[in-house]
Structure formats: C-alpha cells, structure tokens
Design a protein with these regions (language model features):
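A short glycine/serine-rich beta->alpha loop
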Residues: 155-159
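Internal alpha-helical scaffold of NAD(P)-dependent oxidoreductase catalytic cores
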Residues: 35-48, 53-148, 174-181
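Residues that form or flank phosphate/diphosphate-binding pockets in enzymes
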Residues: 31, 79, 166
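ATP-dependent carboxylate/acyl-activation modules
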Residues: 173-177, 184-192
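Rossmann-like NAD(P)(H) cofactor-binding subdomain of soluble oxidoreductases
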Residues: 1-56
Length: 192
C-alpha cells in the first residue's frame, strides 16, 4: 500500500506547526497511523476510514453513512471528530488506530469476497442453464443479505474499481510479511 501521499501531507503539516487534529481517511496499511503518530508526536493523528463506493459516493455519504470508525487512543480526539461528523453517521465506533485501519480492509475484502462468490455461482448457474438472477433475487429477500456486490453479467466480471483489488493485494502482502499460511486473499485476486 503506497502511503507516500499521506506521509508527505503529514510531514508538511508538521513543518507548518499544525495544531489541529489530523484525520487520515485514505486506506493505509494497518500500523501506519501508529507509526506516523510516533514519528510526529506533536500532531494528533487519527484514522477515520470512509466507506464509500466509487460509483455512488455521494449517496453513500448522505444516505448510507451508517458507520463512522474513529481510530484514536485519545478520548478528546474521538469526541471532536465525532462532533465534526454531525448527524450523518448512524453509528460511531472508537477503536485503536490499527484496528480502525483493519476495519477498512475487512470491509473492502468482504465486498471482494461477495463478488468472487457471486461470480462463481453465476458460472455454475450458467452451466446448468438456470437463472442466476432469479436465484440471487430470491436470496436477497432475506433481510440480512444485501443486493450489493451480487450483480453478475457476461460482459464484465470481477472487481469494478481500484479499491477492492488494491486492498486485497495489500492484505495478501501483509499475510506474507506475517508469515501466515493463508491463501484466501490470493485466491480472491486470482478469481477476479
């Protein structure tokens, strides 16, 4: 995950003796906010991920803004950032910065997994000459299952943006660095 823009921006704020809260919203590798906080102890840095889909960011911000995660060790920073977000988020959650960073990855890879699962079922249905659309539309009648990320067609398959492949690759590399024997994230990339 390339964090150079975030690091450069925070370095500039530090050089200019910035005194406010720095809320990082860009997806960064888990541990980045903690590292930057240690590097710039005079800045109050927190991680506040956005959960916007590329194709409908405005609608997500206004209508589907159901969660605001604030990654900070400071109660005061949490309070101020929460207040700054006003009434849009339905839920607020204070976590450690690294936990908040991981929530963002979990969200995106969860969505990538749904795409992979849907494309696989689409292929099975196509081979069996049955309607994926009818099956999917029946499934989403269950209250806990959303229609998001379940659309499939012959013209375009796999990821439809830059965030999901980028974040899945970043977690696959993190798993490698941690010497974990988990192929799941690489499988998602291979399938998309």
């Amino acid at each position: 995950c390339d964090t150079s823009i975030v690091e450069e921006s925070i370095s500039r704020l530090n050089k200019n003796n910035y005194k406010g809260i720095v809320a990082v919203k860009s997806t960064v590798t888990p541990g980045t906010t903690k590292k930057l906080s240690e590097q710039y102890p005079n800045l109050e840095i927190c991680f506040v991920p956005e959960f916007l889909r590329e194709r409908c960011a405005m609608i997500d911000f206004v209508e589907n803004h159901d969660l605001c995660v604030i990654g900070t060790e400071s109660e005061e920073v949490y309070r101020k950032v929460r207040q700054a977000h006003g009434h849009y988020p339905k839920n607020f959650r204070r976590l450690k910065p690294t936990e908040a960073e991981m929530v963002k990855y979990y969200n995106n890879i969860y969505n990538a997994t749904l795409i992979t699962l849907s494309n696989s079922f689409y292929e099975v249905c196509k081979k069996m000459e049955i309607s994926y659309s009818d099956i999917k539309n029946s499934l989403v009648l269950r209250e806990h299952i959303s229609d998001s990320y379940l659309q499939c067609n012959d013209n375009f398959r796999g990821f439809g943006g830059v965030c999901l492949p980028k974040d899945t690759l970043a977690i696959a590399k993190l798993v490698e660095r941690l010497n974990l024997d988990i192929d799941f994230f690489k499988m998602i990339l291979d399938e998309n």
